[in-house]
């Protein structure tokens, strides 16, 4: 009979023979924290300012006239805005905030008009302040010198430069040197004739406003005549016209007085006489009988000749050089009418 073990020992042995309980599972490692999202750096841009409707370098304008500052911004970001400030004598006088319009190639632009009620320098500055989408950046400032519109013989400076530039743009014969000399005075008189203004060799606000609007251009009547001359007896001006009706040059002139009127009609230059003749006519271009386009010492603002078309002597040489034998000459009154009778004694 097998030997029985004591009870405590049996219990201990039974416990030893039982399978071991599994070890508790290890706790899972904590998940790694997500990396913080990176915010893209705000884009940096650039602004280029351009002043429009001003003349020369440095830009000049007339007080009361509107100038436009145009800003080109790159890169263009929808919804972004630019602050434009205007300074006079270092003091801020106006601030405007403007939006941008896309213009392609990743750029945008803005236009902002401004003017000055007094003479002096006005500076425009543009800044884009930082936003989440764009960093802060600015453009190079632009300065405009505003000048009085009242200039006359002997004046020099920005107002005269503006005057000469505007007259030249309308094809009046004028120097571009910033001096109100005799040639500038002649151009002003020619312009005033065409624009229907008082015939004085000076300027004012009205004249500059009309120039800015393009008033006072010469209206070509005979576009089909190609390269030709037109003499407007109503306004007392003469114009050289290129093919397709392009105005080349406009001059003041004086035609035949009422007792010896200039004949109207369509003619062609048939003879040219350089220099001065016995009657004091300079560089003459004859278009019918004794009627000629020529220089003369006296060219009043009204019809005063014996039938010829007088032009200032300083303009006679250039007209003589431009006109050829066979060049058409159209002489007319704007409202029609005029004398068709050829006077055999026509002269200066």
Q: What are these model-predicted stretches?
A:
Residues 65-75:
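Aromatic/hydrophobic beta-strand junction motif of beta-rich domains
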Residues 118-137, 289:
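Enriched for extracellular/lumenal, surface-exposed ectodomains of secreted and cell-surface proteins
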Residues 93-105:
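Solvent-exposed serine/threonine-rich low-complexity stretches and specific carbohydrate-binding patches
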Residues 84-88:
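Conserved aromatic beta-strand anchor motif in extracellular beta-sandwich/beta-rich domains
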Residues 151-161, 165-211:
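Short acidic, glycine/serine/threonine-rich helix-capping segments at coil-helix boundaries
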Residues 1-32:
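Secretory targeting and sorting signals
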Residues 34-62:
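Short, compositionally biased P/S/T/A/G/V-rich stretches that sit at domain boundaries
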Residues 81, 162, 169, 218-224, ...:
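Exported/periplasmic cell-wall-interacting domains
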